[in-house]
Curated annotation (Swiss-Prot):
Residues 12-136 form the MH1 domain. This is Mothers against decapentaplegic homolog 1. One of its GO terms (cellular component) is male germ cell nucleus. Transcriptional modulator that plays a role in various cellular processes, including embryonic development, cell differentiation, and tissue homeostasis. Upon BMP ligand binding to their receptors at the cell surface, is phosphorylated by activated type I BMP receptors (BMPRIs) and associates with SMAD4 to form an heteromeric complex which translocates into the nucleus acting as transcription factor. In turn, the hetero-trimeric complex recognizes cis-regulatory elements containing Smad Binding Elements (SBEs) to modulate the outcome of the signaling network. Phosphorylation of the C-terminal SVS motif by BMP type 1 receptor kinase activates SMAD1 by promoting dissociation from the receptor and trimerization with SMAD4. Phosphorylation by ERK2 MAP kinase in response to EGF or HGF prevents SMAD1 nuclear accumulation and transcriptional activity in response to BMP. Dephosphorylation, probably by PPM1A, induces its export from the nucleus to the cytoplasm. Dephosphorylation is inhibited by association with EGR1. Ubiquitinated by SMAD-specific E3 ubiquitin ligase SMURF1, leading to its degradation. Monoubiquitinated, leading to prevent DNA-binding. Deubiquitination by USP15 alleviates inhibition and promotes activation of TGF-beta target genes. Dephosphorylation, probably by PPM1A, induces its export from the nucleus to the cytoplasm. Phospho-SMAD1 is ubiquitinated by CHIP leading to disruption of the SMAD1-SMAD4 complex. Found in a complex with SMAD4 and YY1. Interacts with HGS, NANOG and ZCCHC12. Upon C-terminus phosphorylation: forms trimers with another SMAD1 and the co-SMAD SMAD4. Interacts with PEBP2-alpha subunit, CREB-binding protein (CBP), p300, SMURF1, SMURF2, USP15 and HOXC8. Associates with ZNF423 or ZNF521 in response to BMP2 leading to activate transcription of BMP target genes. Interacts with SKOR1. Interacts (via MH2 domain) with LEMD3. Binding to LEMD3 results in at least a partial reduction of receptor-mediated phosphorylation. Belongs to the dwarfin/SMAD family. Gene3D superfamilies: 2.60.200.10, SMAD MH1 domain. The gene is SMAD1.
Length: 465
């Protein structure tokens, strides 16, 4: 018997509860997590029995099992801090759980974590895992009734001319608190609210994670309702804030099935690829994300961890002192995670990150090119597959060019430490010292298949279009 085992003792209650532990969750850490919980529950009459009942009879109704909420909402176990409901769901149900965004409370739960009550329920059977929504296929007309006289190319040119020389800026959470009047027309029968910006946005104070696999973030908004295609109304394109009076006549959705080709969404092997730039120079190879939880940081990791894109490893002979200084401040960088058809960005760096996402801007009613500042410790949803699916379904009725325009929505740009836009002396992202471009493979491949079915544009795309 070694010295460690002489001084270690696991109580019978902890041993019993560990009997229901799932998968390969780190043994010692799980034991400490359960031990910490037992100490809290022993102070409450019947709490231990209720937890054991829930774990032993998962199909049966059970009551809330609560512990006091800490000041920051997190629970420290050994050297790691995490959200309590996520920790115990990870121990007893889903060892591969990545973040709180993957959990939703059941209706029977009286003390869900998101309710911010003095007590928080840690009963793992009072939470369910968020599943990726099934996106409806896009119905592409076989015979387009789109009138080439109503070319949208001129409107695209006008839109580009009317856009500000520099993007607008917004700071999270300040610019996100008040509902924004939505500049994009919505389908009359859309299941989305009239003002997406009025929904509760992500909580502003999300503590930084220790690693991409740790469940240590504060909650964000829940996924929006599934898109219900309109049955008898004309849909309007919402991909850009164009003059709807000039829109080409759409194709009525209520058309014969034989006249359309259904194009379904397919989840790709790599949900995104990330390319790193310094000023206008691409540096290194693209990083292909197979894990749904990715860290992009300024450190070096020679182990080639598939969950980390370490910018500290990349060299550039043209690097100047400004770039060198900026790279030193990237630090823990950004945590990107893809869950339930949504992409979130959490700033782990001590310095802010700056994101340009047309999908996020659409949701909040901002100008398409707005750059959003995400301060340290904050988390923001930067892409929503369901909203993209709605826009794509509407856009096919307005022709090839409108659908093609959505490719801009599938590329996200993000700079570290230094921002750009109207409030900064850097006008363009290529003027920032360190930035990344994120290509979302699923939406891009879906667009590609839809465009293939639509054939060629009425006006050939050229260098001036």
């Amino acid at each position: 018997m070694n010295v460690t085992s002489l001084f270690s003792f696991t109580s019978p209650a902890v041993k019993r509860l560990l009997g229901w532990k799932q998968g390969d969750e780190e043994e010692k850490w799980a034991e400490k997590a359960v031990d910490a919980l037992v100490k809290k529950l022993k102070k409450k009459k019947g709490a231990m029995e209720e937890l054991e009942k829930a774990l032993s009879c998962p199909g049966q109704p059970s009551n809330c099992v609560t512990i006091p909420r800490s000041l920051d909402g997190r629970l420290q176990v050994s050297h790691r801090k995490g959200l309590p409901h996520v920790i115990y769901c990870r121990v007893w149900r889903w060892p591969d759980l990545q973040s709180h965004h993957e959990l939703k409370p059941l209706e029977c739960c009286e003390f869900p974590f998101g309710s911010k009550q003095k007590e928080v329920c840690i009963n793992p059977y009072h939470y369910k895992r968020v599943e990726s929504p099934v996106l409806p296929p896009v119905l592409v007309p076989r015979h387009s009734e789109y009138n080439p006289q109503h070319s949208l190319l001129a409107q695209f040119r006008n839109l580009g001319q009317n856009e500000p020389h520099m993007p607008h800026n917004a700071t999270f959470p300040d610019s996100f608190q008040q509902p924004n009047s939505h500049p994009f027309p919505h389908s009359p029968n859309s299941s989305y609210p009239n003002s997406p910006g009025s929904s509760s946005s992500t909580y502003p104070h999300s503590p930084a994670s220790s690693d991409p696999g740790s469940p240590f973030q504060m909650p964000a908004d829940t996924p929006p309702p599934a898109y219900l295609p309109p049955e008898d109304q004309m849909t309007h394109d919402t991909s850009q804030p164009m003059d709807t009076n000039m829109m080409a006549p759409g194709i009525h959705p209520d058309i014969h099935r034989g006249d359309v080709q259904a194009v379904a969404y397919e989840e790709p092997k790599h949900w995104c690829s990330i390319v790193y730039y310094e000023l206008n120079n691409r540096v290194g190879e693209a990083f292909h994300a197979s894990s749904t939880s990715i860290l992009v940081d300024g450190f070096t990791d020679p182990s080639n961890n598939k969950n980390r894109f370490c910018l500290g490893l990349l060299s550039n002979v043209n690097r100047n002192s400004t770039i060198e200084n900026t790279r030193r401040h990237i630090g823990k960088g950004v945590h990107l995670y893809y869950v339930g058809g949504e992409v979130y960005a959490e700033c782990l760096s001590d310095s802010s990150i700056f994101v340009q996402s047309r999908n996020c801007n659409y949701h909040h009613g901002f100008h398409p090119t707005t750059v959003c500042k995400i301060p340290s410790g904050c988390s923001l949803k930067i892409f929503n597959n369901q909203e993209f699916a709605q826009l794509l379904a509407q856009s096919v009725n307005h022709g090839f060019e409108t659908v093609y325009e959505l490719t801009k929505m599938c590329t996200l740009r993000m700079s570290f430490v230094k921002g750009w836009g109207a409030e900064y002396h850097r006008q363009d992202v290529t003027s920032t010292p360190c930035w990344i471009e994120i290509h979302l493979h699923g939406p891009l491949q879906w667009l590609d298949k839809v465009l293939t079915q639509m054939g060629s544009p009425h006006n050939p795309i050229s260098s001036v279009s």
